[in-house]
């Protein structure tokens, strides 16, 4: 959730603008503009849909629409402005063979992720298994922890610390783990247990699993995704 906020400085020079409705004088923080963005966005929510757990969060700073579809499917359409993350999966998460497919189209290769995303508690950890991403590679601003050969590809492992940032437990300081696929793809099968074990071997301790979803995340970009989680709920 809100993972991009830790890399705003690095991203701002890269982030493109694709606003459908420009803010007066380019100011995106005015009250009328903020209200307009919120009216055009799907409100944050969590719950169950067709047996799957879903999580949807947006900071309300961009027009973004999230829709749950049949089975394990969902879609997201977004435009420039803020941060969002959402998708379908399981509560609790854990070691699972996840098969997914779909489309992931950030406009102009903008800042966005297609990933397996989740949290653990005790310790509090936010983790990403990145399958595809736009122009920004989050590993560039995190500490390297080695590589993993898995799911027919190579993943680089990384770790960073988030200080006093939003989490599933409120504002906390916690670790953020990454596994970033070098051969980007929009479909495939991921055995999450392989990644959890690789992180543990690298000294990156996992906790008790909270939710885990096949997620789309975006920050100051535009695009669309249509994802189908094929692994049963």
UniProtKB/Swiss-Prot annotation:
Disruption outcome: Retains 88 percent of the catalytic activity. Double xyl1/xyl2 deletion mutant retains 19 percent of the activity and exhibits a 50 percent reduction in accumulation of total mycelial mass.
Catalytic function, reaction form: Endohydrolysis of (1->4)-beta-D-xylosidic linkages in xylans
Matching InterPro entries: ConA-like_dom_sf (IPR013320), GH11/12 (IPR013319), GH11_AS_1 (IPR018208), GH11_AS_2 (IPR033119), GH11_dom (IPR033123), Glyco_hydro_11 (IPR001137)
Pfam families cross-referenced by the UniProt entry: Glyco_hydro_11
Pathway(s): Glycan degradation; xylan degradation
GO terms for cellular component: extracellular region
Residues at the active site: 126, 217
Glycan attachment residues as annotated in the record: 27
BP-aspect Gene Ontology terms: xylan catabolic process
Keyword Signal appears in the UniProt entry: yes
Domain GH11: 40-230
Keywords: Carbohydrate metabolism, Glycoprotein, Glycosidase, Hydrolase, Polysaccharide degradation, Secreted, Signal, Xylan degradation
Residue pairs linked by disulfide bridges in the UniProt entry: none
An MF annotation (GO) of this entry: endo-1,4-beta-xylanase activity
Compartments where found: Secreted
Signal sequence, renumbered to the chain: 1-20
Chief location: secreted
Membrane-spanning parts: none
Regulation: induction: Expressed in presence of rice cell walls or on oat spelt xylan, but not when grown on sucrose.
Keyword S-adenosyl-L-methionine: no
Family the entry assigns: Belongs to the glycosyl hydrolase 11 (cellulase G) family.
Annotated function: Endo-1,4-beta-xylanase involved in the hydrolysis of xylan, a major structural heterogeneous polysaccharide found in plant biomass representing the second most abundant polysaccharide in the biosphere, after cellulose. Accounts for approximately 70 percent of the endoxylanase activity in the culture filtrate.
Protein name as it appears in the record: Endo-1,4-beta-xylanase 1
Species this protein is from: Pyricularia grisea (Crabgrass-specific blast fungus)
């Amino acid at each position: 959730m809100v993972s991009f906020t830790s890399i705003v400085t690095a991203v701002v020079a890269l982030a493109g603008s694709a606003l459908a409705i420009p803010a007066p004088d380019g100011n995106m923080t005015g009250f009328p503009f903020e209200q307009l963005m919120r009216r055009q966005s799907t409100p944050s929510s969590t719950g169950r849909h067709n047996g799957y757990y879903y999580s949807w969060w947006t900071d309300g700073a961009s027009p973004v629409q999230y829709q749950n579809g049949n089975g394990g499917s969902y879609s997201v359409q977004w435009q420039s402005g803020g941060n969002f993350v959402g998708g379908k999966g399981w509560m609790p998460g854990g070691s699972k063979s996840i098969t997914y497919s779909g489309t992931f189209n950030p406009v102009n290769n903008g800042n966005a992720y297609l990933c397996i995303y989740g949290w653990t508690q005790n310790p509090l950890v936010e983790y990403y298994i990145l399958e595809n991403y736009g122009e920004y590679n989050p590993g560039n601003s995190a500490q390297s922890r080695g590589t993993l050969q898995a799911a027919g590809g190579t993943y680089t492992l990384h770790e960073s610390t988030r200080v006093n940032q939003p989490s599933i437990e409120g504002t906390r300081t916690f670790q953020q783990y990454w596994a970033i696929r070098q051969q980007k793809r929009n479909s495939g099968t991921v055995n999450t247990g392989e990644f959890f074990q690789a992180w543990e071997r690298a000294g990156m301790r996992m906790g008790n699993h909270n939710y885990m979803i096949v997620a789309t995340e975006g920050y100051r970009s535009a695009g669309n995704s249509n994802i189908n989680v094929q692994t049963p709920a």
